[in-house]
């Protein structure tokens, strides 16, 4: 390109990289040469020649479920708005797989990585920080890495949901939580328990699901088979609530006339079930 345009390689580099400090006639010569030769920049070569790859990485626990699809969509949209590419991989539900996924993205010279990991230990994450790796943790709070953590006030949200049931007059309330090994699941359950304790009311039951339709259905069915069933159920995510709603319908109960149902978060499907969540 430089030879055809009659300029230096440094000038071509400035034009290709969008440097405004190039005179218009020179820029036009370079652009004509680029078009004539069909030249396209090599991102890998650029990354090797500089300290930046213009690429971000995302590690998710899984690709399954509406949450992860929405997460990837939002992250990619934001990355592209800043001229960045996005590489996505999954941890496949084990600490070793999550660690390999993280190392793989850094080996590909990602400028930074967003981690939505469930099994990777706090010590491993501190090790990454000690290695001066650029990463942000999503929905995870690690002591000593607070400045890298983007999380939510799970206890507050759960207290608000539970309080709504209490304010409606319910006293026989059950909870279907997420997997207890997840910090965020424990925090959601904590908020439910705090609201119940503040009202001096004992929960009917606190069953453990896995944030999917099947576990929500299974736990709700178990609750509804009790001799003294709950008058309200709090589900710690939308998918379990939809599964619970199916069980309620199969028991020929009406929401909210016979039993109330409330859930943490609201995804794309919540408005389309009947009654809408």
What are these regions (language model features)?
Residues 2, 115, 232-236:
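Short beta-strand scaffold positions
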Residues 92-95, 116-121, 239:
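Short beta->alpha connector loops
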Residues 36, 74-85, 100, 106-107, ...:
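Bacterial carbohydrate/catabolite-sensing allosteric modules
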Residues 39-104, 108-112, 190-193:
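Amphipathic helical "hinge" segments at domain boundaries
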Residues 1-53:
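N-terminal helix-turn-helix DNA-binding module of bacterial transcription factors
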């Amino acid at each position: 390109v430089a030879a055809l345009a009659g300029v230096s390689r440094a000038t071509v580099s400035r034009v290709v990289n969008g440097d405004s400090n190039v005179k218009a006639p020179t820029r036009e010569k370079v652009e004509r040469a680029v078009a004539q030769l069909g030249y396209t920049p090599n991102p890998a070569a650029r990354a090797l020649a500089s300290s930046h790859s213009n690429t971000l990485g995302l590690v998710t626990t899984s690709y399954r479920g509406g949450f992860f699809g929405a997460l990837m969509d939002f992250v990619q949209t934001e990355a592209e708005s800043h001229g960045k590419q996005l590489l996505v991989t999954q941890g496949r539900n084990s600490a070793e797989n999550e660690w390999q996924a993280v190392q793989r993205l850094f080996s590909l010279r990602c400028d930074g990585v967003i981690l939505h990991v469930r099994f990777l230990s706090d010590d491993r994450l501190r090790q990454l920080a000690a290695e001066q790796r650029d990463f942000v943790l999503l929905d995870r709070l690690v002591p000593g890495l607070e400045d890298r953590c983007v999380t939510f006030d799970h206890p507050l949200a759960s207290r608000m949901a539970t309080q709504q049931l209490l304010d409606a007059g319910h006293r026989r309330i059950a909870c279907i939580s997420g997997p207890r090994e997840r910090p965020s699941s424990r925090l959601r359950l904590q908020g439910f328990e705090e609201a119940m304790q503040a009202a001096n009311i004992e929960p009917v039951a606190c069953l453990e699901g896995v944030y999917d339709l099947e576990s929500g259905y299974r736990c709700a069915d178990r609750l509804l088979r009790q001799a003294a069933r709950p008058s309200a159920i709090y589900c710690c995510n939308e998918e379990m609530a939809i599964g619970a709603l199916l069980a309620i319908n199969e028991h020929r109960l009406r929401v909210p006339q016979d039993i109330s149902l409330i859930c943490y978060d609201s995804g794309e499907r919540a408005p389309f079930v009947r009654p809408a969540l």
